[in-house]
Amino acid sequence: MRTEAALQLGFCALCVMLALLGEGMGRELPDPPAVNCVWSRWAPWSSCDPCTNTRRRSRGVEVFGQFAGIACQGSVGDREYCITNAKCNLPPPRECSDSEFQCESGSCIKLRLKCNGDYDCEDGSDEDCEPLRKTCPPTVLDTNEQGRTAGYGINILGADPRMNPFNNDFFNGRCDKVRNPNTLQLDRLPWNIGVLNYQTLVEETASREIYEDSYSLLREMLKEMSIKVDAGLSFKFKSTEPSMSNNSLKLDASLEYEKKTMIKDVSELTNIKNKSFMRVKGRLQLSTYRMRSHQLQVADEFVAHVKSLPLEYEKGIYYAFLEDYGTHYTKNGKSGGEYELVYVLNQDTIKAKNLTERKIQECLKIGIEAEFATTSVQDGKAHAKLNKCDDVTTKSQGDVEGKAVVDNVMTSVKGGSLESAVTMRAKLNKEGVMDIATYQNWARTIASAPALINSEPEPIYMLIPTDIPGANSRIANLKQATADYVAEYNVCKCRPCHNGGTLALLDGKCICMCSNLFEGLGCQNFKGDKARVPAARPAVTQEGNWSCWSSWSNCQGQKRSRTRYCNTEGVLGAECRGEIRSEEYC
């Protein structure tokens, strides 16, 4: 630690000296010393749980990796097998009433649901008989993909949950139907869905501006992804806690087409020269749904995992639960597909061809119109571009670096088949633009593989059945775990950036997103200093970074408080905007 402090002080002194003496001399400041991930020590092992023969321990992140240092990629929790002489005292299973049937799993269903042709017990034990009568006529199909995946979870830090908490194969003896306009057949609605409406909406937008540097683009993308919590631009796209289930990890080849992968690629474009960026986003909405407000049917495995959570709070296992099911579930959602294209443009070619921003935007959009009078997603129309866009879209000159306007296209696709996403990328790589036929091929596959494209979140602890033993303790623990999870992976554990750079945390690594006037891992260098005729250095307010909040004080006079401090390490004269102290009623 002494060596690191000395390096920081030396770097600070060097920054001041060069800033005062070297302005306009083309001197380039070195990047700040690398900061490696620092974990806290492991807490002592818990006692051995006699019901699972498992003991657990946890640790925390103290400092995230930064300035090309090692990122924090490990897990907070740890567990191992153990042996104990203590007895497992599980509460007795719930006794079903005379009007109920007990499934082999121990759950209870209404007796009228027995032998109706539906698996109202997830284990199918209610159908060990000849169906007396089927709930739905044979013309009605099973539930569609929108119904099967309804309610899928959301992680407020960005990771995709590994499991769905709902049992959407439960119908409660009802035969609610909806006509699917894509198949023209009737689909059956699960009990958990209160309303499902099919409504085709198509939209396509191009960024209002061409981004001059990758940081401006990245900053905009991250702000769009962030959910409004007190976490700043903090993201954790990779789940790092071991799953509570052996069957939760589903490796999907389409992951390479996720927006998270695109964000990672953009964040690594720090040294690219003479390039600018433009975004084109498209969305095809097929349906909207609303979950029931009460009596939601959760999966047996979800209940089993809730029951296995220790009554005494231990953050590692609770984090694992949140990464399995999400910090929230989807109360209301929209299903369909969306794509995002980031065009890497060659500035030299744009200037040589005298192209305007407006022309580039119009030519790189697909040009989709929606025929809302029809019910098919295949009836899109394309604006005729004729040959006026050849100087923008053609890649026939792309064999030689720098001749084409479009150097590269980064693709993010959500919804639809993997094959259609591959075709889309191949078309973009070959011609630099996507046409209406490629779009239609992708759109046709969305009905069979829809994605959640918009959601209204509700805390996951709201799904815990209140009739299970220890429900209130586990609900309180999950509330604390959600707050701790956001605080654990937070930019407050990063060091500040120079010259007004914006801090972001991506998968255990802090990055400084510089304004278009500055560069370097810490935004320490003014680009104008390297020009043949040095530009005047602008006046910049140096900003520190708030530390993490302290723990809440004890409740006194119906109030409690917490504090934080302004971290200015490595940035002289920096200040923080905001309050040092906060209070709330208790």
Curated annotation (Swiss-Prot):
Transmembrane spans: 229-236, 357-364, 365-373
Domain TSP type-1: 36-89, 543-585
SMART domains: LDLa, MACPF, TSP1
UniProt-listed InterPro entries: LDL_receptor-like_sf, LDLR_class-A_CS, LDrepeatLR_classA_rpt, MAC_perforin, MACPF, MACPF_CS, TSP1_rpt, TSP1_rpt_sf
Domain of life per record: Eukaryota
Cell compartment(s), UniProt: Secreted; Target cell membrane
Membrane topology qualifier: Multi-pass membrane protein
GO cellular component labels: extracellular space; membrane attack complex; other organism cell membrane; plasma membrane
Complex and partners: Homooligomer; about 20 C9 chains oligomerize to give rise to a huge beta-barrel that forms a 100 Angstrom diameter pore in target membranes. Component of the membrane attack complex (MAC), composed of complement C5b, C6, C7, C8A, C8B, C8G and multiple copies of the pore-forming subunit C9.
Record function comment: Pore-forming component of the membrane attack complex (MAC), a multiprotein complex activated by the complement cascade, which inserts into a target cell membrane and forms a pore, leading to target cell membrane rupture and cell lysis. The MAC is initiated by proteolytic cleavage of C5 into complement C5b in response to the classical, alternative, lectin and GZMK complement pathways. The complement pathways consist in a cascade of proteins that leads to phagocytosis and breakdown of pathogens and signaling that strengthens the adaptive immune system.
Protein name listed in UniProt: Complement component C9
Gene of this entry: c9
